[in-house]
């Protein structure tokens, strides 16, 4: 899922291109607005943390791009390309390492399960 910052910075095409270059196939894409209830459920594990409200506020601040990808070892390939959550720890060449400016505004979410 590409978060609001990606759209604001016009990086959607670049992110999709990087995923396709890894041999993955985009099989679904939808631009949506996440409501506060869905955001709360998505970030439930962080509910008691100090940054929770900022996470919910950011993800609901504009449209996101939900995507479904297909390919060999897809989840592992995507998570490796996405990079560490903290952009200061993300390696150059990863999406977060190259484009993220702030941990909470890390431009992309990648699932760890199908």
Q: PLM features: what roles do these ranges have?
A:
Residues 1-114:
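Non-catalytic terminal and connector segments of soluble metabolic enzymes
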